[in-house]
Structures are given as structure tokens and as C-alpha cells.
Design a protein with these regions (language model features):
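Patatin-like phospholipase
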Residues: 2-6, 11-101, 127-129, 135
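Short secondary-structure capping/junction motifs at helix and strand boundaries
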Residues: 75, 103-112
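Active-site gating loop/helix substructures
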Residues: 108-135
Length: 135
């Protein structure tokens, strides 16, 4: 039997599932990365799924979130939101943190990871990319 682990989104609330996963790893006596055969996540859950697919422990991911939450979820000004941009957070620190802590290419992951994505224009839904689909 194969086991897929899916993690929900929720921005800064993504730390909640990580608290549960830390406890689960402690109870199991092993990393979820070694238990799951594939990982999936939406939004902030995709970051957690990517970490697990790279062999990181829930504890490592929890600490990464805890130490970086204020910088990742630093709100942008309301003027910027009302202009051409529709996002509420500046992603520059998040991008830097991901580049420093995660593998650069999906084919380098230890396990398959699946991350749904779409264009924000609402006109189309694109393919869900996985480990075997290249970059």
C-alpha cells in the first residue's frame, strides 16, 4: 500500500499542521518523509510538502516557519494592494528563504511532490506539475 500525504494551505496558519506532524513523527519514531510515498500541498502546504519530499523533518520545517513567519507574512501597504497588485504580502523574503533551504529542481526531490497552480486571471486552470514533469 502506498501513502500520500496532503497538507492544507492557510498562510501563517500552516504552522498548525506542522505542530501535529511534529507530534506524529515523535509518536512514530521516524520522519514523515520516510513514511509517505508522495506529498502534495496547497499554498503554504506546498512549502511543507516540498520540505517533506526533500527529506526534512517536521521539526526542521516547524522551526523554519517559526523563525521566518514575521518576515514571510509581512503585509504590504494598502496603497500597493489598491494599485495593480492583488497580493497582500511581499514574496521577496519567502523566495530567498526557499532558495536557501530547498533544492532548486523538482527532479532533485527524494519523493514525488504535487503542487496545484493556476493563473490568477481566472480564465484557465493549468496542469498540476509533479516530480517527473521537469522544472
Amino acid at each position: 500500500m502506498k501513502l500520500g500525504i496532503s497538507i492544507t494551505g492557510g498562510g501563517a496558519l500552516g504552522i498548525g499542521p506542522l505542530q501535529f506532524m511534529r507530534r506524529l513523527e515523535a509518536d512514530l519514531g521516524k520522519k514523515l518523509a520516510s513514511v509517505g510515498d508522495a506529498f502534495a500541498g496547497t499554498s503554504t502546504g506546498s512549502i511543507v510538502a516540498t520540505g517533506l519530499a526533500n527529506g526534512m523533518t517536521a521539526e526542521t520545517l516547524y522551526n523554519l516557519y517559526k523563525d521566518n513567519l514575521p518576515k514571510i507574512f509581512k503585509k504590504v501597504s494598502s496603497t500597493r494592494i489598491l494599485s495593480k497588485s492583488y497580493y497582500r504580502y511581499d514574496n521577496s523574503y519567502l523566495k530567498k528563504m526557499l532558495q536557501e533551504n530547498f533544492k532548486k529542481h523538482m527532479y532533485e526531490f527524494k519523493k514525488p511532490v504535487y503542487i496545484p497552480a493556476t493563473f490568477l486571471n481566472g480564465k484557465s486552470v493549468e496542469k498540476v506539475w509533479g516530480k517527473d514533469d521537469g522544472d
